[in-house]
Amino acid sequence: MFAKVTSLGLSGLAGYVVQVEADLSSGLPDSAVKESSERVRSAVKNLHYPWPSSRITINLAPADVRKTGPVYDLPLLVGLLAAQGVLPVPAPHQAFLGELGLDGTLRPVTGVLPMALAAVTLGVTELFLPAENAAEAAEAAGLTVYPARMASDVVRHLCGEEAITPAAPGGFDEAGTWLGPDMADVRGQAEARRALEIAAAGGHNLLLVGPPGTGKSMLAKRLPGILPPLTYEEALETSAIYSVAGLLPAGSGLLKERPFRSPHHSVSTAAMAGGGSTPRPGEVSLAHNGVLFLDELPEFSRDTLEVLRQPLEDGAVTVSRVHGTARYPCQFMLAAAMNPCKCGYLGHPTRECTCTPSAIEQYRRRISGPLLDRIDLHVEAMPVEYEALAAEAGGESSAAIRARVTAARKVQQERCTDLPGVRCNAQLPGAALRKYCRMTPKAQQILRAAFERLGYSARAYDRILRVARTIADLDGSEQVDTAHISEALQYRALDRKAM
């Protein structure tokens, strides 16, 4: 007696079909039963279905791909019951996912959204899974999702006794009014506010430098409120990563807000880039389409900071481990904050810095030149004057800034329709950069003079052009002129030869 049941697996965010094969043959039962089979055995008995008295052989194909976790409990149960003739053998277009409790309840599993999205392209049209996973799976167009709370619900459906009502797609609406921290709460800091707007409009990386208490963290935490809402495609990508990581809220569909990740400076390289015996997304991937905020940047270990270089450049990270390799997207905005020196008061108008020149240089060298090169905007946040703090009216609201940012992003997306995967100026490749960042002759002269005097790298040159293009977009200008280049140059204050 033999039965084959379709299930799904994941490699990174790529789904693939897993065939769960169950064969019952004459002979004594195998005593070497793994944990998953023990759960299935208990569930079968507690649901009062027969357990085979003969030898059971289970195969999960393809055999050369490592399969872990409890996701195959439900297809194992269905396969064993089908092999005994308790229920019809499911059709190949029907797939099954889910962990079994010992009493036969179905518990949610991770990675359902990317598996459901892949299932449609792999010929699967029906998916049976735990009810808590139904909302995310229903986002896959062309897939009928059957949510169940007990394994017995699935058995009765397959036997034609009691049909399961398919889950309805939740639909996707862009996030409405921002209810988080608002830029209107920020007093003063006009230059930093302007830099945040430019960073949000073009997707640029940002470094805030200033003494303690000047509002660097406060400003960074308001970045999500001025970023444009997630598009449907971005929401799918981001939600898929959170599904794999097990961070998608139970019973919810797609995420609607851009992620904001703020790991502690003690974070390991594996936690930052991704890792584990079975590769899992790290902080850089969890910040995909959102913001990765690193407060007290020099306090992070050198290895942890250096691991950011490749993700910042490529927008993707490959995690290699003994049991497999996974590739995750990580197109994020890096926002970082740091003190100007170890004591924190270099350049403070009223407090004296106690650091020696060599101590200041040593402190700043904790951030390597190549990493600093990849940060587009270097901004000073100085203490706010009393008049600004005491003023009744705050600054401009996040909603007003977001409207300008969204308009600038729309211009960029229309400009880049012929560039797959490019959504903002920060992602413009070299050839497109020269095409779309045409400068006036005077602007070229200013950039050339700065390049020769300060010794910018080729990477810094490209990033200055991208920032200038974003400033021009905010101004509604087709061409990059002297004002745009000059403002972009002022945000490179921490380049090594400019210090």
Which residues make up each language-model segment?
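Peripheral, non-AAA+ core regions of ATP-driven protein-machinery
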Residues: 1-207, 211, 217, 320, ...
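Basic, amphipathic alpha-helical bundle interface domains used for macromolecular binding and assembly
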Residues: 28-37, 50-52, 59-69, 278-279, ...
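Catalytic P-loop NTPase motifs of RecA-like helicase/translocase cores
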Residues: 103, 294-301, 344
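P-loop NTPase nucleotide-binding/switch module
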Residues: 159-198, 202, 229-284
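Walker A/P-loop
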Residues: 208-249, 314
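The Walker A (P-loop) glycine that initiates the GxxxxGKT/S ATP-binding motif of P-loop NTPases
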Residues: 210, 274, 296
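Walker B catalytic acidic pair
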Residues: 289, 295-296, 307
